[in-house]
Amino acid sequence: RFLCISPWNFPVAILIGQISAALSCGNKVIAKPSEHTSILGYLVVRKFHECGVPLSALELILGDGLYGDMLTKINSLQGVAFTGSLPTAKKIQSNLIENQNQIVPLIAETGGINSMLVDSVHY
């Protein structure tokens, strides 16, 4: 299984991208959205199921970071896609090293400093 952990600040786009990439490579997926965007995570996964992705190919786990921590300790993971903070990415990497009997890919996008410009044109 491939674990996809998405952030609160881009809850739909990033989760869809992570799930789509993992499924298209033939992986079963565990989706774990941020605890702040559980409803959106549920709706994204439900839409995948409505489009024909089998329940057995895409599972949803809801909860806070403790659930994410436990999921990264599953010793049968084939990979992890994570978007979030650098400290959390380092914890995931540590869990993967400690709990896997093989090298497991970690795709971590961290740091996400996004700027937004607002000017009078938008009012």
PLM region spans:
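Rossmann-like NAD(P) dinucleotide-binding subdomain of oxidoreductase/dehydrogenase enzymes
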Residues: R1-Y123
